[in-house]
Amino acid sequence: MNPKKTRWLSGPYIVWMALFVIIPLIIVAVYGLTNMDGSFTVQNVLAMGQQVHMKAIWMSVQLALISTIICLLIAYPLALIIRALKIKSTGFVIFLFILPMWMNFLLRTIAWQSLLEKTGVINSLLKAVGLSPLNMINTEGAIVLGMVYNFLPFMVLPIYNALIKVSDDTLNAARDLGANGVQTFFKITLPLTTPGMISGITMVFVPSLTTFVISDLLGGAKISLIGNVIEQEFTTANDWNLGSGLSLVLMVVIIGSMAIMSGIDKRGEGTTLW
């Protein structure tokens, strides 16, 4: 089929991108670079340098990194186990990981709120066996737990997809040449699955950095992430200009982190890590 005759098929996608991606970004940029009078200003962007905002973004980066590392440490062994299963069982196991994602994100987080609160299910069980209740809700640990639970599938699936592309013949050849299990993993498996790891890290880190629902429900008012600050500027303070300015800075941070991940992926694909 002639490519020139099929270009029109991209028309709906272009319209969709223009309406729901490009135009909203332009609106955010206009609000972020103007004040309430409509005059040009960079004060909304520079406001990120204020102590309260720096504290929020630093806390966001910290918790996002912790959540991403935990997801990676859980997901990689899990993906290895899934790959080692028989083909008939593998599809069912993948289905079990995807199944929770069919439930609404908000409902999944509220469920964890019910489990972790002072009178929740976990503390009720602890009391039933004579143990002291734990202070789990409204803590940084609760937020990290919520992030890991919600975003873990986004780490497992890319790593698993990378693992199934590693041929058994390649691994067997390494063993035939005298490599033990550890050497085979670090010299063959890990380098070949680096693209999947990078993809998973990006897919977990970015939503963890920008989330505000998880921190609202599991962190309460005690812990404020940059997503909460931006959300409050739009909804509570009704200052769309400041909220948009902070969003622009956060967008630059995200784009920078994705660029770094892409650079690592390009250098690491198909090569050894050391």
Describe each model-derived feature in a short phrase:
Residues 51-84:
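Transmembrane alpha-helix signature in integral membrane proteins
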Residues 11, 15-54, 115-119, 220, ...:
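Short membrane-interfacial helix/loop motifs at transmembrane-helix boundaries
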Residues 12-21, 95, 99, 149, ...:
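Transmembrane alpha-helices
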Residues 2-7, 58, 88-91, 140-142, ...:
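Amphipathic cytosolic juxtamembrane alpha-helices at the membrane-cytosol interface
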Residues 9-10, 78-115, 171-172, 185, ...:
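Cytoplasmic-entry segments and transmembrane alpha-helices of multi-pass inner-membrane transporters
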Residues 4, 45-52, 212, 216-266:
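Interhelical loop and adjacent transmembrane-helix boundary motif
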Residues 42, 109-148, 182, 218-222:
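Membrane-interfacial helix termini and adjacent extracytoplasmic/periplasmic loops
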Residues 3-13, 23, 27, 160-175, ...:
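C-terminal transmembrane helix and the adjacent membrane-cytosol boundary/short C-terminal tail
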